[in-house]
């Protein structure tokens, strides 16, 4: 049985949650997000709290309720506070610059990479080797950060590449003669 589903989701002031059948929509200062509830899960709204419960008592229903509760909590947090992800560019000549809705990346290739940001994600570069991505949608933010990191993932010998700011790169020792 999922213990995650038993905890209610607290809805802060300024966030509105509406349910239309299986579609749940969350509106806040940072935008509007929505998702579809699983058929085994039902949503109950009380003043300032959302409670998810399985329709019937089964292991699968509790698993889906726990997942739906985590997703709903991320939606509420996203539209009220937002999420951010920091990337670091480590390597000689590695640079990033934001131009409108795209990021220009120089990652040691013979050509620069222009990464077009999807709608709902913003980027800023406080320094040439640091990228800060912000979004209300946690899943989309993680996907964008992963795609940027995928152009030049950190290599284990020198640690060069694009990495998350909280990522620890395991270093290998060079081959000895």
Curated annotation (Swiss-Prot):
SUPFAM superfamilies, A to Z: Ribosomal protein L6
One BP annotation, GO: cytoplasmic translation
Key word Transmembrane helix present: no
Keywords assigned: Ribonucleoprotein, Ribosomal protein, RNA-binding, rRNA-binding
Gene Ontology molecular function: any one: rRNA binding
Gene Ontology cellular-component annotations: cytosolic large ribosomal subunit
Disulfide topology: none
Record bears the keyword Cytoplasm: no
InterPro entries the UniProt entry points to: Ribosomal_uL6-like, Ribosomal_uL6-like_a/b-dom_sf, Ribosomal_uL6_a/b-dom, Ribosomal_uL6_bac-type, Ribosomal_uL6_CS
The protein's role, per its UniProt record: This protein binds to the 23S rRNA, and is important in its secondary structure. It is located near the subunit interface in the base of the L7/L12 stalk, and near the tRNA binding site of the peptidyltransferase center.
Quaternary structure (record): Part of the 50S ribosomal subunit.
Family, as annotated: Belongs to the universal ribosomal protein uL6 family.
Protein name (Swiss-Prot/TrEMBL): Large ribosomal subunit protein uL6
């Amino acid at each position: 049985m999922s213990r995650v589903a038993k905890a209610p989701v607290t809805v802060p002031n300024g966030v509105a949650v509406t349910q239309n059948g299986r579609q749940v929509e969350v509106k806040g200062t940072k935008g509007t997000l929505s998702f579809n509830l699983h058929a085994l899960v039902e949503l109950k709204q009380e003043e300032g709290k959302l409670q998810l419960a399985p329709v019937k008592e089964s292991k699968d229903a509790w698993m889906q309720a726990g997942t739906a509760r985590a997703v709903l909590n991320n939606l509420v947090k996203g539209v009220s506070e937002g999420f951010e992800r920091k990337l670091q560019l480590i390597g000689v000549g590695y640079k990033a610059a934001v131009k409108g809705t795209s990021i220009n990346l120089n990652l040691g290739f013979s050509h620069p990479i222009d990464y077009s940001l999807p709608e709902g994600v913003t980027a800023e570069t406080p320094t040439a080797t640091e990228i800060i991505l912000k979004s209300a949608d946690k899943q989309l933010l993680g996907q964008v950060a992963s795609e940027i990191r995928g152009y030049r993932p950190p290599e284990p010998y020198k640690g060069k590449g694009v990495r998350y700011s909280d990522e620890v790169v395991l270093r290998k020792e060079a081959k000895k003669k």
